[in-house]
From Swiss-Prot:
GO MF annotations in UniProt: magnesium ion binding; phosphoglucosamine mutase activity; phosphomannomutase activity
Pfam families found in the cross-reference section: PGM_PMM_I, PGM_PMM_II, PGM_PMM_III, PGM_PMM_IV
Gene: glmM
Catalytic site: 100
Reaction catalysed by this enzyme: alpha-D-glucosamine 1-phosphate = D-glucosamine 6-phosphate
PTM sites of type Phosphoserine: 100
GO annotation terms (biological process): carbohydrate metabolic process; peptidoglycan biosynthetic process; UDP-N-acetylglucosamine biosynthetic process
Binding positions for Mg(2+) per the UniProt entry: 100, 240, 242, 244
Cofactor(s) required, per the database record: Mg(2+)
Keywords assigned by UniProt, alphabetized: Isomerase, Magnesium, Metal-binding, Phosphoprotein
Alphabetical list of InterPro entries matching this protein: A-D-PHexomutase_a/b/a-I (IPR005844), A-D-PHexomutase_a/b/a-I/II/III (IPR016055), A-D-PHexomutase_a/b/a-II (IPR005845), A-D-PHexomutase_a/b/a-III (IPR005846), A-D-PHexomutase_C (IPR005843), A-D-PHexomutase_C_sf (IPR036900), A-D-PHexomutase_CS (IPR016066), Alpha-D-phosphohexomutase_SF (IPR005841)
Post-translational modification: Activated by phosphorylation.
Protein name per the record: Phosphoglucosamine mutase
Length: 448
């Protein structure tokens, strides 16, 4: 990771860390790096529903126009919608303004190349080098060589029509509950599932600029679980603020996470001859039960560092078509070049239809190990990982586990947090291991 770019683009508190001034420079320098070999390049921009989205969009657009790029605004749309449309509209670059599942005060900027994939480390390093220069030496076109801006608010519908044709039949006879996190999928997901003839109940579909991810969405699926039980729905689908994650709820109100969704997809794709190289790519955060279920079904797995960009890199390297994270980023590379909550939801409901099995039965074929993840706010992520007392308590706990479970201590890619995770045969043992490590992390480098 660089000085500005984290695991998922540039993030920060809007108007303090991620200022309009910085957004202008990111637009100008990012636009230049991605379009310098093209005459009159086209760049598309989407955003989620945050109040700061308009401010940052205006600054980004100005930066891009100053390089001579033509800018097309998509309005409110999901991150995978931008990824798809970048390639579908033959744009040289796509930009999404969002901080995903983060709270409303945060925002972020992430770029997609002309192929719809996130930027390489080399491209990000080139943009960062320009950001750090004291003098802006890039060309400044004038007159008719300046870029112009236009709106293409139909982009969301074009994207929905594309993902809709990935399923084999409609969803008539199913009652689907949706939680759109007051975010980018708020108008898209209800339209999509109603268009497929499902009965729908919705929540989190009234964005006001301030309520994105606030007690709703994929980070709060327990709220959707109540709606599923109240309405007697067959399935609940919870998206995050920018629509690149999915967490589901079965008909009994049980939460079905990204590991379980990946397993369900992998098993079905193997049975139907669609799973390339019989392999799923996941991260080190995936549950032990996920790997045991894959093994029992003759499916191999490939592990990466945490972050959907690392999953994607491994998928491209190995020629795999299914990967993702426990947090609900599911990548279906046959169809789209990033994690996609609505596409994953379509595939999950399609599997229910084709197998004629309820979600509880499909998810029940994987038994999760008890797991606990605690986030500790720290003063310095790097210092935490080098701290001798923290390293010692991790070693002691791992020895006590004796191979019956695991510990993972890692920094967040986007926030000043250390994540402490354990899996063990019982919840009680799991909790005890985590809290012992958390206490040492707090004592040594805690920010509170």
């Amino acid at each position: 990771m660089g000085k500005y770019f984290g695991t998922d683009g540039v993030r920060g508190v809007a108007n303090q860390e991620l200022t309009p001034e910085l957004a202008f420079k990111i637009g100008r320098f990012g636009g230049y790096v991605l379009t310098k070999d093209t005459d009159r390049p086209k760049v598309i921009i989407g955003r989620d529903t945050r109040i700061s989205g308009h401010m940052l969009e205006g600054a980004l657009v100005a930066g891009l126009l100053s390089t001579g790029a033509e800018v097309m605004r998509l309005g409110v749309i999901s991150t995978p919608g931008v990824a798809y449309l970048t390639k579908a509209l033959d744009a040289q670059a796509g930009v999404m303004i969002s901080a995903s599942h983060n709270p409303v005060q945060d925002n972020g900027i992430k770029f997609f190349g002309s192929d719809g994939f996130k930027l390489t480390d080399e491209q990000e390093a080139e943009i960062e080098a320009l950001l750090d220069k004291e003098v802006d030496e890039l060309p400044r076109p004038t007159g008719t060589n300046l870029g112009q801006v236009s709106d293409y608010f139909e982009g969301g519908q074009k994207y929905l029509q594309y993902i809709k044709q990935t399923v084999e039949e409609d969803f008539s006879g199913l009652h689907i509950a949706l939680d759109c996190a007051h975010g980018a999928t708020s108008s898209l997901a209800p339209y999509l599932f109603a268009d497929l003839e499902a009965d729908i109940s919705t929540m989190g579909t009234s964005p006001n600029g301030m309520n994105i991810n606030d007690g709703v969405g994929s980070t709060h699926p327990e709220v959707l679980a109540e709606l599923v039980k109240e309405k007697g729905a067959d399935i609940g689908l919870a998206f995050d603020g920018d629509g690149d994650r999915l967490i589901a709820v079965d008909e009994k109100g049980n939460i079905v996470d990204g590991d379980q969704i990946m397993f369900i997809c992998a098993k079905y794709m193997k049975e139907t001859g669609q799973l390339k190289h019989n392999t799923v790519v996941s991260t080190v955060m995936s549950n032990l039960g996920f790997y045991k279920a894959l093994e029992a079904n003759g499916i191999t797995s490939d592990k990466t560092a945490v972050g959907d960009r690392y999953v994607m890199e491994e998928m491209k390297r190995g020629g795999y078509n299914l990967g993702g994270e426990q947090s609900g980023h599911i990548i279906l590379l046959d169809y789209i070049t990033t994690g996609d909550g609505m596409l994953s939801a379509l595939q999950l409901v399609n599997i229910m239809k084709m197998t004629k099995k309820p979600l509880s039965e499909l998810a029940g074929e994987m038994t999760k190990f008890p797991q606990l993840l605690v986030n500790v706010r720290v003063t310095d992520k790097k210092l935490a990982l080098e701290n001798e007392k923290i390293k010692e308590i991790i070693r002691v706990v791992e020895e006590e586990m004796n191979g019956d479970g695991r510990i993972l201590v890692r920094p967040s890619g986007t926030e000043p947090l250390i994540r402490v995770m354990a899996e063990a045969p019982t919840q009680e043992v799991c909790d005890a291991y985590v809290h012992r490590i958390v206490e040492v992390v707090k004592a040594e480098v805690g920010a509170e």
